[in-house]
């Protein structure tokens, strides 16, 4: 039997609301991956890998939404540093960090709301929990979604 302590995280958020027209929001998150640890057994080597091969990271999310009568328009940006120190040393032009954006539209027909959204995220991962940097994976993920809400 063992226990695993995950990374610690501190988040600060803020938003400014422009009456009923719109808003701008901002989130900042600091994560400490070096304090991850197994306990309850002989995990010294693994815990030293966490301390040596992972780092503190920063992440930001910025978003906005505006209303024009029944139409709502949204947009956002995200950036998160890769916690892997091997990736941080080996990446170029911050390609080892996660970046992305999102866009959305919604229209309120009264008793029916239609919403469409798009999200794009790019990152380069260096996979392997215990030996970071073994495998590099470039990914570009796009997601479209749609929602129809009916008020009865």
Q: Residues of each region from the PLM?
A:
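Outer-membrane beta-barrel porins/channels
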Residues: 1-152
């Amino acid at each position: 039997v063992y226990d695993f302590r995950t990374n610690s995280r501190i988040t600060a958020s803020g938003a400014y609301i422009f009456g009923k027209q719109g808003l701008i929001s901002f989130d900042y998150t600091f994560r400490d991956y070096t304090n991850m640890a197994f306990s309850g057994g002989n995990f010294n080597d693994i815990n030293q890998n966490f301390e040596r091969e992972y780092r503190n990271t920063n992440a930001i999310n910025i978003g906005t939404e505006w209303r024009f009568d029944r139409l709502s328009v949204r947009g956002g940006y995200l950036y998160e540093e890769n916690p892997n120190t091997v990736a941080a040393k080996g990446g170029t032009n911050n390609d080892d960090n996660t970046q992305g954006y999102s866009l959305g539209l919604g229209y309120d027909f009264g008793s029916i709301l239609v919403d469409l959204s798009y999200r794009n995220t790019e990152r380069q991962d260096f996979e392997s929990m215990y030996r970071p940097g073994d495998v590099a994976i470039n990914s570009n993920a796009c997601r479209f979604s749609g929602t129809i809400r009916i008020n009865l």
